[in-house]
UniProtKB/Swiss-Prot annotation:
Protein's name according to its UniProt entry: Protein E6
GO MF annotations, alphabetized: DNA binding; zinc ion binding
Keyword presence, Repeat: no
Lineage per the UniProt record: Viruses, Monodnaviria, Shotokuvirae, Cossaviricota, Papovaviricetes
Domain of life, source organism: Viruses
Subunit structure: Forms homodimers. Interacts with ubiquitin-protein ligase UBE3A/E6-AP; this interaction stimulates UBE3A ubiquitin activity. Interacts with host TP53 and EP300; this interaction inhibits TP53 activity.
Zn finger limits (unnamed): 31-67, 104-140
Organism expressing this protein natively: Human papillomavirus 43
Functional description taken from the UniProt entry: This protein may be involved in the oncogenic potential of this virus (cervical neoplasia-associated virus). Plays a major role in the induction and maintenance of cellular transformation. E6 associates with host UBE3A/E6-AP ubiquitin-protein ligase and modulates its activity. Sequesters tumor suppressor TP53 in the host cytoplasm and modulates its activity by interacting with host EP300 that results in the reduction of TP53 acetylation and activation. In turn, apoptosis induced by DNA damage is inhibited. E6 also protects host keratinocytes from apoptosis by mediating the degradation of host BAK1. May also inhibit host immune response.
InterPro entries (alphabetical): E6, E6_sf
SUPFAM superfamilies: E6 C-terminal domain-like
Amino acid sequence: MSARSCSQNARTIFELCDECNITLPTLQIGCIFCKKWLLTTEVLSFAFRDLRVVWRDGYPFAACLACLQFHGKISQYRHFDYAAYADTVEEETKQTVFDLCIRCCKCHKPLSPVEKVQHIVQKAQFFKIHSVWKGYCLHCWKSCMEKRRRSETMC
Protein backbone atom coordinates (compact mmCIF):
# COMPACT_ATOMS: atom_id res chain seq x y z
CA MET A 1 0.00 0.00 0.00
CA SER A 2 1.33 3.42 -0.84
CA ALA A 3 0.43 7.04 -0.38
CA ARG A 4 -1.26 6.89 -3.78
CA SER A 5 -3.89 4.40 -2.58
CA CYS A 6 -4.62 6.21 0.69
CA SER A 7 -3.54 9.40 2.41
CA GLN A 8 -0.71 9.60 4.91
CA ASN A 9 -2.98 11.18 7.52
CA ALA A 10 -3.68 7.86 9.25
CA ARG A 11 -2.06 7.75 12.67
CA THR A 12 -3.52 4.48 13.97
CA ILE A 13 -4.17 1.07 12.44
CA PHE A 14 -7.92 1.75 12.62
CA GLU A 15 -7.57 5.07 10.78
CA LEU A 16 -5.35 3.39 8.18
CA CYS A 17 -7.98 0.72 7.53
CA ASP A 18 -10.72 3.36 7.25
CA GLU A 19 -8.75 5.57 4.87
CA CYS A 20 -7.65 2.67 2.69
CA ASN A 21 -11.08 1.01 2.81
CA ILE A 22 -9.78 -2.36 4.03
CA THR A 23 -10.60 -4.53 7.02
CA LEU A 24 -8.25 -5.01 9.95
CA PRO A 25 -7.73 -8.77 9.35
CA THR A 26 -6.76 -8.15 5.70
CA LEU A 27 -4.25 -5.38 6.44
CA GLN A 28 -0.70 -6.23 5.45
CA ILE A 29 1.85 -3.94 7.05
CA GLY A 30 5.58 -4.24 7.60
CA CYS A 31 7.61 -3.84 10.77
CA ILE A 32 9.52 -0.54 10.87
CA PHE A 33 12.48 -2.29 12.55
CA CYS A 34 12.94 -5.77 11.04
CA LYS A 35 10.93 -5.16 7.81
CA LYS A 36 9.00 -8.46 8.16
CA TRP A 37 5.26 -8.52 7.55
CA LEU A 38 3.21 -8.49 10.74
CA LEU A 39 0.97 -11.47 11.43
CA THR A 40 -2.74 -10.73 11.82
CA THR A 41 -2.40 -11.25 15.58
CA GLU A 42 0.43 -8.71 15.66
CA VAL A 43 -1.63 -6.18 13.70
CA LEU A 44 -4.50 -6.65 16.17
CA SER A 45 -2.10 -6.37 19.09
CA PHE A 46 -0.57 -3.18 17.66
CA ALA A 47 -4.06 -1.71 17.29
CA PHE A 48 -5.09 -2.81 20.81
CA ARG A 49 -2.01 -1.09 22.24
CA ASP A 50 -3.06 2.15 20.57
CA LEU A 51 0.35 2.56 18.95
CA ARG A 52 0.95 4.94 16.06
CA VAL A 53 1.64 4.10 12.43
CA VAL A 54 4.97 5.39 11.08
CA TRP A 55 5.17 6.59 7.48
CA ARG A 56 8.37 6.16 5.44
CA ASP A 57 8.60 6.98 1.72
CA GLY A 58 4.82 6.88 1.35
CA TYR A 59 4.39 3.51 3.08
CA PRO A 60 2.93 2.83 6.53
CA PHE A 61 4.79 0.71 9.07
CA ALA A 62 3.98 -0.77 12.45
CA ALA A 63 6.12 -2.91 14.79
CA CYS A 64 6.05 -6.65 15.38
CA LEU A 65 5.84 -8.02 18.93
CA ALA A 66 9.46 -9.15 19.05
CA CYS A 67 10.75 -5.74 17.95
CA LEU A 68 8.42 -3.90 20.36
CA GLN A 69 9.80 -5.87 23.29
CA PHE A 70 13.40 -5.68 22.10
CA HIS A 71 13.39 -1.93 21.46
CA GLY A 72 11.47 -1.34 24.69
CA LYS A 73 14.21 -3.12 26.63
CA ILE A 74 16.94 -1.21 24.78
CA SER A 75 15.15 2.05 25.61
CA GLN A 76 15.05 1.03 29.30
CA TYR A 77 18.80 0.43 29.33
CA ARG A 78 19.78 3.50 27.33
CA HIS A 79 17.28 6.09 28.51
CA PHE A 80 16.26 5.19 32.08
CA ASP A 81 15.98 8.44 34.04
CA TYR A 82 14.67 7.32 37.44
CA ALA A 83 11.85 5.53 39.27
CA ALA A 84 9.27 7.20 41.51
CA TYR A 85 6.04 6.52 43.36
CA ALA A 86 2.71 7.93 42.17
CA ASP A 87 2.81 10.94 44.51
CA THR A 88 6.18 12.01 43.10
CA VAL A 89 4.93 11.56 39.53
CA GLU A 90 1.90 13.72 40.34
CA GLU A 91 4.04 16.35 42.03
CA GLU A 92 6.38 16.55 39.07
CA THR A 93 3.71 16.61 36.36
CA LYS A 94 1.09 18.64 38.27
CA GLN A 95 -1.48 16.02 37.14
CA THR A 96 -2.87 12.87 38.70
CA VAL A 97 -1.54 9.59 37.35
CA PHE A 98 -5.10 8.97 36.12
CA ASP A 99 -4.88 12.01 33.83
CA LEU A 100 -1.50 10.99 32.41
CA CYS A 101 -1.00 8.62 29.51
CA ILE A 102 1.32 6.06 31.09
CA ARG A 103 2.28 3.07 28.96
CA CYS A 104 3.58 -0.34 29.95
CA CYS A 105 7.35 -0.40 29.69
CA LYS A 106 7.27 -3.96 28.31
CA CYS A 107 4.33 -4.18 25.90
CA HIS A 108 3.65 -0.43 25.42
CA LYS A 109 -0.09 -0.68 26.08
CA PRO A 110 -1.61 2.38 27.79
CA LEU A 111 -2.22 1.57 31.46
CA SER A 112 -5.84 1.44 32.54
CA PRO A 113 -7.00 3.16 35.74
CA VAL A 114 -7.03 -0.27 37.43
CA GLU A 115 -3.40 -0.84 36.47
CA LYS A 116 -2.43 2.57 37.84
CA VAL A 117 -4.25 1.79 41.10
CA GLN A 118 -2.30 -1.49 41.25
CA HIS A 119 0.94 0.52 41.33
CA ILE A 120 -0.38 2.75 44.11
CA VAL A 121 -1.81 -0.07 46.28
CA GLN A 122 1.23 -2.33 45.82
CA LYS A 123 3.57 0.62 46.40
CA ALA A 124 5.24 -0.03 43.06
CA GLN A 125 7.19 2.67 41.31
CA PHE A 126 6.63 4.15 37.89
CA PHE A 127 9.68 4.58 35.66
CA LYS A 128 10.73 7.68 33.80
CA ILE A 129 12.28 6.45 30.58
CA HIS A 130 13.33 8.93 27.92
CA SER A 131 11.41 11.65 29.81
CA VAL A 132 8.14 9.66 29.66
CA TRP A 133 6.45 7.92 32.61
CA LYS A 134 5.92 4.17 32.27
CA GLY A 135 4.73 1.31 34.46
CA TYR A 136 3.50 -2.27 34.07
CA CYS A 137 0.15 -3.47 32.75
CA LEU A 138 -1.46 -6.34 34.68
CA HIS A 139 -0.27 -8.95 32.18
CA CYS A 140 3.36 -7.82 32.29
CA TRP A 141 3.15 -7.19 36.05
CA LYS A 142 2.29 -10.85 36.60
CA SER A 143 5.16 -12.13 34.46
CA CYS A 144 7.63 -9.74 36.16
CA MET A 145 6.54 -10.80 39.64
CA GLU A 146 6.94 -14.47 38.70
CA LYS A 147 10.48 -13.76 37.49
CA ARG A 148 11.32 -11.94 40.71
CA ARG A 149 10.09 -14.89 42.79
CA ARG A 150 12.46 -17.12 40.83
CA SER A 151 15.28 -14.65 41.59
CA GLU A 152 15.81 -13.74 37.97
CA THR A 153 16.66 -10.29 36.75
CA MET A 154 14.01 -7.62 36.76
CA CYS A 155 11.90 -7.23 33.61
